[in-house]
Amino acid sequence: MIYKPGDLPERCTETMSFRPRVKRLYFRLCADSLPIFGKRVFLLCAIRHQVTRFCSTYLEMKSRRYCRKEETMKKKIVTLLMASVLTVMCATGCGNGNQNATDNKVDANTQDTQTESVSDDQKAADEVADLIDAIYVQERTDDTDAQCEAAKAAWDKLTDAQKALVEGENADPDYFGRDTGDASQDDPRNQDDIGENEILVVSFGTSFNDSRVADIKGIEDAIQEANPDWSVRRAFTAQIIINHVQARDGEKIDNMDQALDRAVANGVKNLVVQPTHLMHGAEYDELVEAVNNYSDKFESVKVAEPLLGEVGDDATVVNDDKKAVAEILTAEAVKTAGFDSLDAAKEDGTAFVFMGHGTSHTAKISYSQMQAQMNDLGYDNVFIGTVEGEPEETSCENVIEAVKNAGYKKVVLRPLMVVAGDHANNDMAGKDDDSWMSMFQASGNFGSVAAQIAGLGEIEGVQKLYVAHTAAAIGK
């Protein structure tokens, strides 16, 4: 309870009227101190007792006409009153000090508990990050299967709050947490007992399930349908992706060595390797080298052409494969954008930008050849770019400048890649400032920028090109 001067006992109030100085002192002490006493009622009782006793003493003295000692007694009363009040206030202060110390200790303990909780959460998240980083490698070992299983099991034990804290050299919450589609719709094509004839379709790979099904499986299915007397099998060249899919989805995909060893174990005699790579780049060269190491294990080994065929050394000389891809890709992009023709898109002020990967390999001339082919076909509003900016004219900045100078105010981005995986979803259409979508928008030159996230592999016309390349290899 909080006491105010008006709540004092009547006798005390009357008594304190004997001198304004004493009255002011009393009320000042009460007004300043009594709110504190509200926290401790017993202290209030003590001071009330002292005040009452002193006031009664004074009245008694006055009634007995101790006039000569009045001034002396007044001084004693005031002194005793002040001493009593100060004593109680000190006691209260000590009590409050003890209480504050207790409160501070509780707050500190609470903070320590919260800190320990955060520390435990971060520790659990860091352990998972380390496990992810351990399988984010390009080399498979005898421990890889167990490491993939351990990483997923540890992730599943985390709370949602802990999962958000996962951050490593390569690890992040998206490694296990991002939904990329239904992996059960895919087929790793690693079955045994397949007969003597095998077509091994080799891809870089992607951890995006929907894209893997639409693009890579789409090509594999088309080749299998066209070659019923052959068994189509799969291999990925990116162990990082193989580990990711295995750890997250439990789907085991062979790497090149595993696939070739499996073919040998299955007694395959005739092997045709069909790369889904775009061009004769570094990855294609590595693939050929790996196959050559197994050439003595089979009666015949043949490697088919990648999608764009032979490279050549002249940027203005284009083969039939590049021409076909230019026509097929452009037609698909125009249709997806809702136009009846490329000319209709041009009249609308819309340009199409096809983004490839880019490479420092001599095969980078293929991108220049693709742009030359677009120009030869009269596709004035089609531009070729690359993530890596190699060749130089294909960098995002240079492509933005080219589209702006051509006068187009609307842009449609689409990957010039077999698979619409990480590059298409993040480098092209991502929300980060360095994505092509963001950079085109930030340039301020275009009224609209849209993205079509679809790989070449899902286009029927492109699948037929791969089928033709496989047939050519079989017929060699």
Q: What is each stretch, according to the model?
A:
Residues E116-T180:
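Beta-rich interaction/scaffold domains
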Residues G95-G97:
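Bacterial signal peptide processing site
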Residues D174-V412, M417-K476:
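Extended amphipathic ligand-handling, pore-lining, and cofactor/metal-binding catalytic surfaces
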Residues M73-L81:
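Bacterial N-terminal signal peptides that target proteins for export
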